[in-house]
């Protein structure tokens, strides 16, 4: 496995690859969710490149950029064990050679980025677009793999590829959950034992909503009330029912409904969602 730290070495390496290339962008602190993305890429491509880069432009002023876990050696060991072709692990100066005021301004599409996570984390998706587009240009992948847990990010990246006419297939991958049904996240390490138990209200709320839908309930307001009752011990940022353009729904639309939740457990903010 190659470990590439500079753009020059990545470009040289990429030129040597003549067959399909899968790309898995990450911020490190790899868990089984990331592993599932990597394994799918390995199955579907001749080569797989994983990036490990904690992107500063997607963190807000009061967010945990400096505290974000960076176990690089552990991440590299996992990638090598899985059979990854190369890991791109650049420094900030490699990815952002210019100071903020000198950079080209890139913005996420407003209709997908102004609500939900975009409302809670101003500028977050602009930062995501900044780094994803740079990584796509550098790796020039055949396919890129994104988890459905960060559904708003996934929709924005899909739109980015379509709008800028990029010849990249975006592959959405299912949410991976622990045995207690909590969605895997690098931020789960911040939870103590008590908070971990409290966090289980999130998947339980989604499961109960799904059961109600399966029994015939279609009114989003009633379903939301059901979910909020289960989430009452948490600080809920939102529980919303949207279509795939993130437009609010009043009734469930089969195959076109997303149920998205964000809630704080102690100081840790967790996301989850359900595709209906």
Curated annotation (Swiss-Prot):
Catalytic activity: (R)-pantoate + beta-alanine + ATP = (R)-pantothenate + AMP + diphosphate + H(+)
GO molecular function, one term: ATP binding
Chief site of localization: cytoplasm
EC number: 6.3.2.1
Residues reported in the UniProt entry to bind (R)-pantoate: 58, 153
Binding site residues for beta-alanine: 58
Binding site for ATP: 27-34, 147-150, 176, 184-187
Function: Catalyzes the condensation of pantoate with beta-alanine in an ATP-dependent reaction via a pantoyl-adenylate intermediate.
Enzyme class: ligase
GO cellular component labels: cytosol
Sorted UniProt keywords: ATP-binding, Cytoplasm, Ligase, Nucleotide-binding, Pantothenate biosynthesis
InterPro entries: Cyt_trans-like (IPR004821), Pantoate_ligase (IPR003721), Pantoate_ligase_C (IPR042176), Rossmann-like_a/b/a_fold (IPR014729)
NCBIfam families, alphabetized: cyt_tran_rel, panC
Pathway: Cofactor biosynthesis; (R)-pantothenate biosynthesis; (R)-pantothenate from (R)-pantoate and beta-alanine: step 1/1
The protein, known as: Pantothenate synthetase
Species of the source: Helicobacter pylori (strain G27)
Active site: 34 (proton donor)
UniProt similarity note: Belongs to the pantothenate synthetase family.
HAMAP family to which the protein is assigned, alphabetical: PanC
Extra remark beyond the main annotation: The reaction proceeds by a bi uni uni bi ping pong mechanism.
Keyword Transcription regulation appears in the UniProt entry: no
Subunit note: Homodimer.
GO biological process, one term: pantothenate biosynthetic process
